[in-house]
């Protein structure tokens, strides 16, 4: 008790005493004393050491506080009650219970499950009953069906009652014992220390119960006859006479023939010889009737282990000598009949002998052969015995030299006799091997020698490290592949059933179950439980003591001897041993996992996606539309079928370079043409057939075919002449067309002749067909010109051309592509989008839109602009592509080379506004021709409209505004170059000027050519014009009304405009960029057509 007082801790008090074992009102322990000393001594240590001690001390304090909190937690009564109710409910599952509710109702049923809940909100016990029924106290008879499931919640539950619960299986033998009696330690532990196996007793049937099938008959006195005929019985009982004949199901035997009689006599002789043989197999004896079932029990007859006979040995021998003793019926070694000694002093099994049926001559020669075989057998046995004795002596010498610790083997001492025999157990030799020779036949009588009691094998097991030593079986020794990889210490391994550990465990359990004695005599008559070098129980001479003489002494527990040996205790352990895995395997496995995790599965995922997409495409393809390419659904060779049935399968190739199949067709006629052949002279009728030919190897057949082809060609010519004169049916016309098409496609046509032996003209008509990709396709039938086309009906057959091969269709399409190739620099027409929205805000955007324009019916498109690629190269200027083909109207009078940015024109350019003063010193450029008679007239919408003489004349002639070209509004075309060089004055109302903020630099271009801007882009430099509202009567009021150009239309020839180059400003995109629409859509050396920029009434169709 003092020890517990010293360890007691008390936390409290506020006193400040400084003693070693004192505290503020509490006890102090030696542990605290040491802590205080360490805390005081920490001042003399280094800062690092003191810091380490403080951390360690803090960890100890945290652990102590956690333990105190766990000890100070109060006992929860609700938790304990919940545990008791859960245990009780689990014990009552499946019992018939009655549950009382708070309202007084009672439900009876089988308890299925319960739910217990505890908490601040309230706890309770819910019940679920199966096959429940509400209890009615008034009626004793049940009148209602049970409910399959009733759930009673905790708020309604009041009481549960279980009746008829059996608790006997929870009782133990100690509950029936008187509590006042004395109980020993062995009885308390329930184990007396002796491991005993249950003794097995054979099952014997009850003699009162009959096992015969005859006992089940209704009348036991009426026995079935020995020769019962089912046919005779059916005829008597039911009047049914059988028609059974054995010859229907088997081959008829001629029992009167000599062959049958000879074979029957030979078979009877062989059967008698086989039946008269003495066999050591109990199953054969039972089948032949030599052994009855009562002589042996089922364990001996049908068990896989034969427990009787000689001692089993476990030797890994390489040389075996044939046994000469007569094997017993329970022997586990199979011996052929030719190597058995039937005449033995000790009869093995009862046998029935009968003399064979042989002739005297045959019997005499048979006896002579047996005598010679007997002499040879004796000589061979003597030689074998001498060789075995020599081998045994050599083995003993080698074992004494190499393995002094192994047990010595004893050779069997045999008595002298005319014929000596070896041990039945096989002997082994590791140095030499001798072939085994057959022993004496069955009818030779020999005198056998008796062996001594010490009949043991001569082989020893060299593996001393095994847990069983010499007792180890050969199957276990084969498992020892390598000493480091053996899994004898691993329970639960794949080789657990055959591992040395499990074998040692079962062996030691068997040793403990047998009555043993500690002492071991020198003669080896008793068993000692003390192991020898951890190799089990072995005798002094190293032999396994499987059959030993037990002593009459009382059995004693071998536990002390087992506990003293660590190997035996380890073998008896039932715990799973942890396997030791080398570090190399662990690292390899971790590297493998890293490789698996780092694998890029993008390609695999993409492959799956492409596969699924291809699968969807294939599934949506129509059955009559073959797909060409790698993704086409090609059928397997087994799916290729013929739409027509052919009368012959023998085929030959008449045109090898073209195709391997030839279609042979002939027209059927009413007249018959006689033709004589060498094989058969008969009349032949030409019929319509289809034959698929193959290659034939015989030369004779080829010659015959050539002759037939010549005859067929002549017949074909005659038939054509007759077919021109007579009218034919629709089928004949179709065949002729097919013949013409086939002759044009280098296909050979032949006819087949069918012989008519019965003088009956029988014709078999088959359909024309070829191999096709779609087996479900319907044969194509061409439409007759003079007859109405058949209407398509909803049928399961498809209308697909199966006659024309798919290769011809593919080659025709490829041939057309080769004849009309597409240039690589030209964009296909289907890439041109004529309905692309135009730049409405840009008045000079006509040059950027290079797509074809769909003009209205009755309007003529503007003339195409010619292109001269050598013009600029001759003038010394780079070939550039202008942004617009005309100069803005405000800059037409500015000479080249003048900086427009320095000019400051007063006034504005608003319609109807003030004039613009032209700067002094500006000379108009040459080649700019002003329109004659131009007058600015206000339009209906208020916008200025310039009308010229030529335009007015065209309007008066055609009666349409804008002339026959219909370009009144828009038409940004340059003025026509006229041969006259005289400059005309502009009309008085035509005001010239420079727009403010133009900021353009005009290059020195050639005369009579449009200007090329090198500064900023015109749409950004020139201000956008202001468009007024459209005039009344025009649809699309929200559309802009474009201003007419201030210059006239071309009169004779359009102006030549270079279109090879392209003006690129400093801030414009590169020529190869995708945003450069001009470079992408306008190929070089091509013409451009510009649509009118005016408002069009059908503009909604194009925008």
UniProtKB/Swiss-Prot annotation:
Q: What InterPro entries would the database entry show?
A: ATXN2-like, LsmAD_domain, PAM2_motif, Sm, SM_dom_ATX
Biological process, per Gene Ontology:
stress granule assembly
Q: Where is the composition biased (Polar residues)?
A: 516-529
The residue ranges flagged as biased composition, category Gly residues, are 11-28, 960-969
Annotated Low complexity bias: 33-44, 56-73, 312-356, 372-463, 530-544, 637-676, 683-694, 742-763, 930-957, 974-984, 1062-1076
Domain named Sm is located at 84-166
Keywords on record: Coiled coil
- Please note every region of biased composition (Pro residues): 1020-1031
Q: GO CC terms on record? A: cytoplasmic stress granule
Question: Which GO MF term does the entry hold, naming one?
Answer: mRNA binding
Coiled-coil blocks: 258-287, 366-403, 691-730
PROSITE patterns, sorted? SM
Q: Where are the annotated segments for Disordered?
A: 1-75, 305-474, 516-557, 615-763, 901-920, 930-1103
Spans of biased composition, class Basic residues?
1-10
- This protein's source sits in the domain of life called Eukaryota
Q: Where is the composition biased (Basic and acidic residues)?
A: 358-371, 695-741
Q: Which family does it belong to?
A: Belongs to the ataxin-2 family.
Name the PANTHER family on file: ATAXIN 2-RELATED, ATAXIN-2 HOMOLOG
Protein's UniProt name: Ataxin-2 homolog
């Amino acid at each position: 008790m003092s020890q517990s007082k010293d360890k007691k801790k008390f936390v409290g008090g506020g006193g400040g005493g400084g003693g070693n074992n004192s505290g503020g009102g509490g006890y102090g322990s030696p542990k605290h004393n040491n802590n205080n000393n360490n805390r005081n001594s920490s001042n003399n240590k280094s800062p690092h050491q003191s810091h380490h001690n403080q951390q360690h001390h803090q960890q100890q304090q945290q652990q102590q506080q956690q333990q105190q909190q766990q000890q100070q937690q109060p006992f929860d009564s609700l938790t304990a009650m919940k545990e008791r109710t859960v245990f009780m409910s689990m014990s009552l599952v499946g019992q018939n219970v009655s549950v009382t509710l708070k309202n007084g109702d009672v439900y009876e049923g089988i308890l299925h499950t319960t739910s217990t809940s505890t908490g601040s909100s309230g706890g309770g016990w819910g019940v679920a009953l199966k096959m429940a029924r509400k209890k009615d106290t008034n009626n004793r008879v049940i009148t209602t069906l049970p409910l399959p499931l009733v759930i009673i919640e905790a708020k309604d539950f009041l009481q549960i009652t279980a009746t008829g619960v059996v608790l006997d299986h929870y009782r133990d033998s100690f509950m029936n014992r008187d509590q006042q009696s004395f109980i020993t330690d062995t009885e308390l532990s329930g184990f007396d220390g002796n491991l005993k196996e249950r003794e097995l007793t054979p099952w014997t049937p009850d003699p009162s119960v009959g096992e015969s099938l005859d006992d089940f008959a209704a009348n036991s006195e009426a026995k079935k006859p020995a020769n019962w005929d089912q046919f005779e019985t059916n005829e008597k009982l039911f009047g049914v006479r059988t028609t059974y004949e054995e010859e229907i199901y088997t081959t008829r035997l001629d029992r009167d023939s000599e062959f049958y009689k000879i074979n029957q006599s030979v078979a009877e002789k062989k059967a008698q010889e086989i039946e008269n043989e003495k066999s050591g197999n109990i199953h054969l004896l039972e089948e032949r009737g030599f052994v009855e079932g009562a002589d042996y029990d089922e364990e001996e007859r049908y068990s896989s282990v034969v427990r009787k006979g000689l001692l089993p040995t476990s030797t890994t021998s390489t040389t075996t000598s044939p046994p000469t003793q007569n094997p017993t019926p329970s022997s586990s070694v199979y011996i052929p009949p030719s190597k058995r000694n039937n005449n033995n002093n000790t009869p093995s099994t009862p046998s029935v002998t009968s003399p064979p049926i042989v002739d005297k001559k045959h019997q005499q020669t048979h006896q002579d052969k047996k005598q010679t075989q007997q002499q040879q057998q004796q000589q061979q046995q003597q030689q074998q015995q001498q060789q075995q004795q020599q081998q045994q002596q050599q083995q003993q010498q080698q074992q004494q030299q190499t393995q002094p610790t192994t047990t010595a083997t004893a050779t069997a001492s045999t008595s002298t006799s005319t014929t000596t025999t070896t041990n039945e157990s096989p002997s082994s030799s590791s140095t030499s091997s001798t072939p085994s020779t057959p022993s004496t036949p069955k009818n030779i009588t020999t005198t056998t020698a008796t062996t001594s009691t010490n009949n043991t094998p001569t082989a020893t097991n060299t593996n001393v490290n095994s847990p069983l030593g010499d007792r180890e079986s050969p199957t276990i020794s084969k498992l020892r592949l390598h000493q480091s990889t053996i899994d004898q210490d691993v329970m639960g391994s794949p080789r657990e059933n055959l591992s040395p550990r499990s074998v040692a465990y079962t062996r030691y359990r068997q040793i403990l179950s047998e009555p043993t004695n500690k002492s071991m005599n020198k003669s080896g008559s008793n068993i000692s439980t003390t192991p020898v070098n951890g190799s089990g129980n072995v005798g002094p001479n190293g032999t396994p003591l499987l059959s030993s003489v037990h002593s009459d002494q009382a059995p004693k527990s071998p536990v002390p001897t087992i506990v003293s040996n660590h190997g035996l205790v380890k073998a008896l352990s039932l715990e799973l041993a942890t396997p030791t895995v080398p570090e190399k395997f662990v690292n390899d496995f971790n590297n493998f996992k890293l490789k698996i995790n780092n694998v890029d599965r993008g390609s695999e995922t993409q492959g799956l996606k492409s596969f699924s997409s291809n699968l969807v495409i294939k599934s949506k393809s129509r059955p009559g539309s073959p797909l060409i390419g790698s993704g086409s659904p090609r059928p397997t060779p087994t799916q290729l079928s013929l739409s027509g049935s052919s009368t012959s399968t023998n085929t030959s190739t008449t045109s090898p370079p073209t195709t391997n199949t030839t279609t042979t067709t002939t027209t059927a006629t009413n007249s018959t043409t006689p033709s004589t052949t060498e094989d058969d002279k008969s009349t032949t009728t030409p019929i319509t057939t289809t034959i698929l030919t193959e290659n034939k190897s015989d030369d004779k057949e080829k010659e015959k075919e050539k002759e037939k082809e010549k005859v067929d060609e002549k017949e074909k010519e005659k038939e054509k002449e007759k077919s021109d004169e007579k009218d034919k049916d629709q089928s004949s016309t179709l065949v002729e067309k097919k013949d013409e098409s086939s002759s044009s496609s280098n296909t050979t046509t032949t006819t087949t002749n069918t012989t008519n032996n019965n003088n009956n003209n029988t014709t078999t008509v088959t359909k024309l067909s070829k191999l096709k990709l779609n087996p479900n396709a319907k044969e194509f039938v061409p439409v007759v010109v003079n007859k109405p086309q058949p209407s398509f009906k909803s049928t399961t057959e498809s209308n697909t051309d199966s006659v024309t091969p798919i290769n011809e269709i593919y080659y025709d399409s490829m041939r057309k592509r080769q004849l009309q190739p597409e240039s690589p620099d030209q964009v296909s027409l289907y890439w041109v989008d004529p309905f692309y929205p135009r730049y409405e805000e840009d008045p000079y955007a006509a040059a950027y839109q290079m797509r074809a324009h769909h003009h209205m019916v009755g309007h003529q498109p503007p003339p195409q602009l010619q292109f001269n690629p050598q013009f600029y190269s001759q003038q010394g200027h780079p070939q550039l592509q202008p942004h617009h083909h005309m100069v803005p109207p405000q800059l037409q009078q500015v000479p080249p080379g003048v900086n427009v940015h320095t000019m400051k024109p007063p006034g504005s350019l608003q319609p109807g506004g003030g004039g613009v003063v032209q700067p002094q010193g500006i000379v108009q450029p040459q080649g700019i021709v002003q329109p004659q008679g131009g007058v600015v007239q206000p339009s209906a919408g208020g916008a200025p409209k310039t009308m010229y003489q030529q335009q007015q004349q065209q309007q008066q002639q055609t009666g349409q505004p804008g002339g026959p070209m219909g370009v009144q509004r828009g038409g940004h075309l340059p003025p026509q170059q006229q041969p006259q060089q005289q400059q005309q004055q502009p009309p008085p109302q035509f005001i010239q000027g420079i727009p403010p903020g133009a900021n353009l630099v005009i290059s020195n271009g050639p005369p009579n050519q449009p200007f090329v801007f090198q500064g900023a882009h015109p749409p950004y430099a020139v201000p956008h014009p202001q468009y007024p509202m459209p005039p009344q009567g025009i649809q699309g009021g929200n559309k802009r009304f474009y201003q007419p150009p201030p210059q006239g239309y071309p009169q004779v020839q359009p102006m030549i405009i270079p279109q090879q180059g392209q003006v690129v400003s400093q801030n414009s995109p590169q020529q190869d960029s995708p945003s450069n629409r001009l470079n992408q859509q306008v190929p070089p050396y091509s013409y451009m057509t510009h649509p009118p920029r005016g408002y069009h009434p059908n503009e909604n169709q194009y925008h």
